């Protein structure tokens, strides 16, 4: 007998499956997700924990007329399998394959594109309001999980949804985990309520009482009055009911039959409803369930039998690990240094700091705005905070960077992990914009290390600097250079790392880790008789205009390279400097290489760098074109 999953090419096919067979279908989905994530990597734990919710929703609601909005998107793998993408699922997170997150262009069933947390309620409310305005039929469901309720925007959405009173269903997928274990008073409150003997005993007694009393309007009125008076003291739902939602739960998020019955009832309920489902992240796969740190959150390739990562050939340490070690050294030597992250202790490497300095390491939850202003408050009182955060997530705290930190010239260090192209996570997670959006902030020092030692020096420099500073470094391994003791760099001073005797043909100014590709291109061009100098600017702001302009004038041709967006980025900073120094009027030839004005899709990082034209081959080609173009015009 074939798999049930093989008979499902759309949600309409799923509706034909008897409810009694849904548990078997859920098991088939889990097996396929595990096998695929072992090969491709991905968000295993969240997707395994939400299988029954996915199946029950699609069994009851009619997508795409009914809109299912997934928060973050980590838990939507089963959704993809049930909406016509079963055969393509093996390609997820690979070049030319399915995206790792819901994307509107990929399927009509992906109602809203996601990748960052806490957006589902607001988006879903907008959709249900649009249906009211246009008269279009259909329900809207927001599935909020992975700790997204620790994000402030989720409560902003709840607040308006409760006020408007529309027929919005919010499913709270409560697995007590975000990427790392949930933190904060709200999470602690939920945990205590569910663990409370009083709470669980009260629920049992109420159920027994309801089954024993006579039915009738008068009896029901008395019961309702008693329950409402009591539940404010013992149920977690009072928080959501205070925001105008009807609260249902908590229910077993792995009882697919029970979920189907519940969704059928809630589909016809009038007004905003929040269904609280208790799930286990990594459900059905022991290695993920037993991983207390992340429950199989974002895994690379792993062995299905053991759950352990497939070991690659030994190589250099990842920049994330090097940063974490360097930060721990700084915290050991300076008690004023503290570390802050937004639900990313594991991802940013700060788990090492948390283990060694638990009282000086803060995980604030998915609350990037709060993280930055919290750091500002610490800095006001003489503390040296380091905010470690993925580049893509710092975008959420841009106003706080400007208003709360830079405007007050506070000594906050921003450590931006995943700066540049990130690979399989794709469009929503590319760190493409940080150089541009930070370069324009007055008084902020912006650094891009080219290797491990430069990262160590820049972190140390930022902690000695009496003002805001940021350093951004890429995903992946370093260059494998021998480590040096950290030292203070002179702010605003770059370095000439490759010189040539006499007059060079081209000067390449390569920001950050693009330096390696620039040096490789220079070596290849030397074999062709093209003399290339290479500058490591170190600082994107303040720029070493004296060095860069001198080398550009010397060569009369310059290529800038950055793993960031061209619009407003490092190359633009160089152009502005060339203009100020009159080099453009003097005929300086310039080529800027970087990420073009588009969102870069998922693939291996090396392929992405080739796509956008910042690998060694592309740099060499730009130099050849610049030399050939100017020689063709008779310019030396």
From Swiss-Prot:
Protein name per UniProt: 1-deoxy-D-xylulose-5-phosphate synthase
Functional description taken from the UniProt entry: Catalyzes the acyloin condensation reaction between C atoms 2 and 3 of pyruvate and glyceraldehyde 3-phosphate to yield 1-deoxy-D-xylulose-5-phosphate (DXP).
Superkingdom field: Bacteria
Cofactor(s) it depends on: Mg(2+); thiamine diphosphate
GO annotations of cellular component type: cytosol
Classification via SUPFAM superfamilies: Thiamin diphosphate-binding fold (THDP-binding) (SSF52518), TK C-terminal domain-like (SSF52922)
The species this protein was found in: Anaeromyxobacter dehalogenans (strain 2CP-C)
Catalytic activity: D-glyceraldehyde 3-phosphate + pyruvate + H(+) = 1-deoxy-D-xylulose 5-phosphate + CO2
Classification via PANTHER family: 1-D-DEOXYXYLULOSE 5-PHOSPHATE SYNTHASE-RELATED, 1-DEOXY-D-XYLULOSE-5-PHOSPHATE SYNTHASE, CHLOROPLASTIC
E.C. code: 2.2.1.7
A UniProt-annotated Pfam family: Transketolase_C
GO molecular function terms noted in the UniProt entry: 1-deoxy-D-xylulose-5-phosphate synthase activity; magnesium ion binding; thiamine pyrophosphate binding
Family under the similarity heading: Belongs to the transketolase family. DXPS subfamily.
Gene Ontology biological process terms in this record: 1-deoxy-D-xylulose 5-phosphate biosynthetic process; isopentenyl diphosphate biosynthetic process, methylerythritol 4-phosphate pathway; terpenoid biosynthetic process; thiamine biosynthetic process
Binding site for thiamine diphosphate: 74, 115-117, 147-148, 175, 285, 368
Binding-site residues, Mg(2+): 146, 175
Co-factor binding comment: Binds 1 Mg(2+) ion per subunit.
Magnesium in keyword set: yes
Keywords attached to this entry: Isoprene biosynthesis, Magnesium, Metal-binding, Thiamine biosynthesis, Thiamine pyrophosphate, Transferase
Keyword Lipoprotein: no
Subunit and partners: Homodimer.
Protein's pathway: Metabolic intermediate biosynthesis; 1-deoxy-D-xylulose 5-phosphate biosynthesis; 1-deoxy-D-xylulose 5-phosphate from D-glyceraldehyde 3-phosphate and pyruvate: step 1/1
